[in-house]
Amino acid sequence: MLILIETPKNLLPFKFNKTSSSISHGANNISSILLNLFINDLTIHKIIVSDISDSDYKIINKEYASKKNTLITPYKNLKSQIEKTEKIPDICINFDANITKLIHFRNINKYTYPIIGLIHSLGFYSHFKTIELTKKLLQEYDTYICPSKNTQQSLINFGFPKKNTAVISYGVNTTKFKPNNNKTQLRKDLSIATNATVILILGRVSPGLKTDLSPALKLMPNLVKKHPDLILYIAGTVLDETYLSKLKTMSKKLKIENHIIWEPFPDHKNIQKYYQVSDIFLSLSDCCAETFGLTVLEAMASSLPVIISNFAGYKDHIKHKSNGYYISSYTADCNLENDYYNPSNKEFGEIYSQSITLNYKQLKTYLLQLIQSPDLQKQIGQKARETIKEKKTQDIMYNSYKNLISHIINKKNNEEKFLEIPDYINISDLFSHQCSHQLTYNDLFYLTNDTKEKVEKESHFFFFENQLTNYDLITPIIFMLNTEPMTINQLASKLNKSKTLVAKNCLFLLKQTFIRANMT
């Protein structure tokens, strides 16, 4: 078998100069892991094409590649390299969604080998534009590997043929991600109280590109009142400094700043230590581009009980109340088109995030159950690790890739398949399957008691000013709900506004816990 692999230079396991090495994480980490597994597999012959220079090419092939049944070449030499081997690749793979360059190379040269791409992130306009470019160029057995069934469904909703997709879960290194028996010393090293109950949130700090953290902070005062030794440990690269500043201001006003540890510069090389010092893992993702949630698997492998949203790519991670807990997620049909087709991923990410709300009553209940019972923490955590070892290790992931490759090669033919693509789609329909519950226009909405008090006292609300430009019905909705509960239909009628616009504002208010709905 001869496999053609396309990869960027920065993922190659070589040091071209003193400054070329870097620590990859997230999607890049998965791509790097898969690349290394293929390179080190001596049973497979590979040609690797990359954006390397001529000098890089000489160094690599002289010192390393010949020992690994591997040839590495720059793009300009790819055709001649294939001719030298006197064998056309059986299949081609890129551990990324952008496979257009490979497709063009194949089609121009009239090769017929299948091409595989990997979807890491899918939800923004820019992501779907990449997919759109490939659709009309596909052949029969070209395939996108999706890390979750949810991601596959997003492709299908977009109009992508199911037969050109496959689902393979990510896997984690259970030797690296495991419990550490010396938690006391680890906590001392990180200046964390040894007797504290630590809830870990690990991920990018951004209101729309991972998780809006503000609702979780609002739960803390009540939890801390019952459990004064509680610590919320938030570790993640900060993508929005202004947002972080506002979260810190909020924590001070809520008087919980002494119960929060911020780690804005996590050590990605030793990322496992953050799991090993913690007791509970919390991930409430509401990002439209969430395809999997690798940190959830890392936490489970580290024997942490996880509490996660049953949103998007998270849906298949756990069995509820057995090896973790799911929090219900809600949305409604609200007009997202104008924001989606805006080229700013950040702006759309924030707006979409505020259109997703979770059942925070459930979250509080499950957190209290775990906080109050170290035995339950241990029991759920052990089952979580067993799940990973049985179903989601790196070896299982790699073998699944090899099995899929063999299957595609065996079934390939020379028929080219050109696919149609809609020019315009309803974005709410595109993401309609992401949440577990769909609010209707007839659901009743109420003000929370806290909001009623603030209205009566004319107190300050915790709002993020930049978001208010997208939600201009907040004030009238609050004052109307202060008189009586209403549905979206009723609010839209009284305000003489569209139902989708009212729904958008109501979801924001739900997200920020200013109102509640008759959610089960």
Regions found by a protein language model. Give the residues of each.
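A short, active-site helix/loop in glycosyltransferases that binds the activated sugar's phosphate group
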Residues: H127-T134, L138-V167, V172-K176
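C-terminal amphipathic helix plus adjacent low-complexity
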Residues: S344-Q354, Y360-M480, T487-Q490, M519-T520
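Short hydrophobic beta-strand element within catalytic cores of glycosyltransferases
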Residues: P305-I308, I318, Y325-Y326
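Extended catalytic core of nucleotide-activated donor transferases of GT-like folds
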Residues: D54-E140, D472
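Acidic donor-binding loop of glycosyltransferase active sites
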Residues: Q276-T291, L304-P305
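Nucleotide-activated donor-binding/catalytic signature segment of Leloir-type glycosyltransferases, i.e.
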Residues: K68, A235-G236, L244-K269
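Conserved donor-binding/catalytic core segment of Leloir-type glycosyltransferases
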Residues: A193-T211, L217, Y233
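A short helix/loop element that forms part of the nucleotide-sugar donor recognition site in Leloir-type
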Residues: K178-I192
